[in-house]
Amino acid sequence: MCIRDRFQNDEQNQDLALVLSDLCELADRLPNHIGFYNGVGAGASIPDHFHFQFFQRAPDLPKFPLEERTFSNIDCDFTTTLVEDYPLCVFRWMGELGEVVEKATSWITNFIKTSKFEKQQLTANFIASRSMTSKTVTLYFVPRHRFKQFWNGNAGIVGGLEILGEIVLASNEECNLVRYDIMNFEFIEQGLSRISAPFTTDKADEL
């Protein structure tokens, strides 16, 4: 399934529900892992090459910064929540597998239809995990502007890990940011803010 086509071309009729169902079902089967699906301009390293990526949680890092943030309700049935005090606009659903997929699919479909931006400008990150102590599945949705993808000028693609709050350094120049004490929490916050799509906040306010 191609999130780019889902956003860009209704004739493709890609099934968002299937993407979310597959991602969340895999997360449900892998409770000690976290998985993500990146769209074009949102961390997909090879154009038109779409796949789920899962990795096992490190014992010394049980939670990522995003997972520790507070989320507030933005709809009347209290199922869709929006992150507070974070450099990116992130929506979250929590619950049993089927409920999460159903609620998220409905809400995101409406989000796409009512967005004031053209569909070819829209992309997204989806991140899913399952609780170690219960059957609660968590799904994050990060709507993105596909031409805003770098945290460091014209380098440093923001994908699933960066959304979670972990910056991946892929070059000597980026590693020097740590070596010379330039990389700190404020620097990371500013970098992630560069790819935040303003329309998402507007949409959250409207909803």
Please give the residue ranges for each predicted region.
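Conserved His + Asp/Glu catalytic blocks
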Residues: N9-S21, L26-I46, F55-L207
